[in-house]
């Protein structure tokens, strides 16, 4: 299947019709969509699945790859930040959101969302730093 993304995609779709909630098949389907140049379809799939399971770091990573393939840098960094935040890597998450702020794309609404999430994560960073201080 490595050299045949379209064939792999067909197999994943058939398998998912039988096992719709199987995460491994879902991830494989999205990966095959990206390999087949179907970044917009991959983005639709990740976005729909994230509505159901917003705390899935793998989906956020696949969404970041989808945005990257579409050239949407702000959204790419934002999705990557969510992946890092879910993994507890707050420093990396903050860095990604700072990159998102500097991205030359995105509209006012998207920038506002990035700014708000950046504030949230910085507060969380400060709270965690306070908890680590010796008494």
Where are these predicted regions, by residue range?
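Alpha-helical linker/edge segments of TPR/alpha-solenoid repeat scaffolds
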Residues: 37-40, 69-79, 109, 119-135
């Amino acid at each position: 299947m490595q050299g045949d993304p379209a064939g792999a995609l067909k197999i994943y779709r058939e398998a998912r019709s039988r096992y719709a909630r199987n995460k491994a098949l879902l991830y494989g389907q999205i990966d095959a969509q990206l390999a087949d140049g179907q970044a917009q379809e991959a983005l639709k799939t990740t976005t729909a699945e994230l509505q159901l399971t917003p705390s899935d770091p793998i989906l956020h990573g696949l969404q970041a790859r989808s945005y990257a393939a579409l050239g949407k840098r702000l959204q790419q960094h934002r999705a990557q930040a969510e992946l890092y935040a879910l993994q507890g890597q707050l420093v990396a998450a903050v860095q990604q959101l700072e990159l998102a702020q500097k991205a030359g794309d995105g509209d006012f609404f998207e920038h506002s969302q990035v700014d708000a999430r950046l504030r949230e994560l910085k507060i969380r960073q400060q709270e965690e730093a306070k908890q680590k201080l010796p008494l």
